[in-house]
């Protein structure tokens, strides 16, 4: 088992531009330290139904209402997350979708890097990498995030919503885990979905592709990424 950079095709070039947007890095940094309620706020706003901050402040009284902190770091983060999420919501539908996907990948990378040793200069955490196995045709699509630690490798695919869970994704993750086992290697297959866990489980129940050995990280459990 070995890891390789993805080929710089047209898709990769376009997506690299999206990932390099300051808004992506700013939103990801905020969401990496966010509370569950703040992450739910971000998801709701970024769906683009309304770009009026007052609408969302009224819908999330625990963050902005009379009982919410009037000031301090938590209130400032809520305001910053709302502002960044509105910026995403104001984009056109296609660009908004791309930006949201890039944010989920960036949040995932930031949290994974908090694991012991993962933040070192020679970090094993990488983006957009393929996993190669002897005698097996390489997958077309690279993995969003990989942890390339010998004996504790991980392939992570990231999705904005539960509807992104499909047979192709599940097959690719499970195939990688299986091929690694064939080579006596350990590889954890993980899918990160920025959506409610219940929605993800309902979606998985409808899938016939193998997923029993694939780890699910949903909106409520994002912080588990930092603990392995």
Regions found by a protein language model. Name each.
Residues 1-228:
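Intrinsically disordered, low-complexity Ser/Thr/Pro/Gly-rich regulatory segments
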């Amino acid at each position: 088992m070995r890891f390789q950079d993805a080929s710089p095709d047209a898709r990769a070039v376009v997506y690299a531009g999206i990932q390099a947007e300051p808004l992506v890095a700013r939103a990801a940094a905020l969401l990496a330290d966010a509370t569950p309620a703040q992450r739910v706020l971000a998801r709701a706003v970024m769906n683009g139904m309304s770009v009026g901050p007052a609408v969302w402040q009224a819908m999330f009284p625990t963050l902005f209402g009379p009982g919410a902190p009037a000031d301090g770091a938590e209130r400032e983060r809520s305001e910053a997350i709302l502002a960044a999420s509105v910026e995403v919501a104001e984009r056109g539908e296609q660009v908004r979708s791309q930006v949201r996907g890039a944010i989920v990948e960036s949040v995932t990378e930031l949290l994974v890097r908090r694991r012991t040793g993962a933040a070192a200069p020679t970090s094993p955490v990488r983006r957009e990498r393929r996993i190669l196995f002897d005698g097996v045709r390489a997958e077309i699509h690279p993995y969003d995030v990989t942890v390339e630690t010998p004996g504790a490798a991980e392939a992570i695919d990231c999705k904005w919503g539960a509807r992104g869970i499909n047979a192709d994704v599940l097959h690719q993750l499970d195939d990688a885990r299986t091929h690694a086992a064939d080579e006596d290697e350990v590889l954890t297959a993980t899918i990160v979905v920025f959506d409610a866990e219940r929605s993800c489980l309902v979606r998985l129940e409808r899938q016939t592709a193998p997923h029993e050995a694939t780890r699910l990280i949903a909106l409520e459990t994002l912080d588990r990424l930092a603990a392995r």
